Amino acid sequence: MQPCLVKIRRIRSGSDLPLPRYMTPHAAGMDLCADVDADLVLEPGERALVPTGIAIALPDGFEAQIRPRSGLALKHGIALVNSPGTIDPDYRGEIGVIIVNHGADAFVVRRGERIAQMVFAPFVRAELLDVDELDETARGDGGFGHTGR
């Protein structure tokens, strides 16, 4: 496992909120909490940017992926609009979570509620080579379910 030392800074009123943390010894993602001043009511079909009150500094070659929490999706229909969201290593602003309510009922985001998870991953930067043709493969250009069920 490659080490990844991440610097974190509280940038809002979140000193009463826990820093992101792993909830089990083998969890891949750290839970992020909502740093809202008042309850945020999300009606069915609505979306909102939920502040977390934190900013991070990642080492070069790493990204942070913001992902949904499965329990919120299953129980309430809460999802992330851009999943996963990507935090680049040069971004220093507050991490925000864009959520949408796909459920049938209003959903209330309360201060300190765990709303998403953050997974750290190394990445590579590709170099593109402009060519006239691509190598042939058995699959070819088949996509979008062409292999059946």
Swiss-Prot record:
Co-factor(s): Mg(2+)
UniProt KW Ribosomal protein keyword: no
Keywords, comma-separated and alphabetical: Hydrolase, Magnesium, Metal-binding, Nucleotide metabolism
Residues of the signal peptide: none
UniProt binding sites for substrate: R69, S70, G71, N82, T86, I87, D88
BP GO terms, sorted: dUMP biosynthetic process; dUTP catabolic process
E.C. no: 3.6.1.23
InterPro entries, per the entry: dUTPase (IPR008181), dUTPase-like (IPR029054), dUTPase-like_sf (IPR036157), dUTPase_trimeric (IPR033704)
Entry protein name: Deoxyuridine 5'-triphosphate nucleotidohydrolase
Organism, as annotated: Geobacter sulfurreducens (strain ATCC 51573 / DSM 12127 / PCA)
Gene expressing this chain: dut
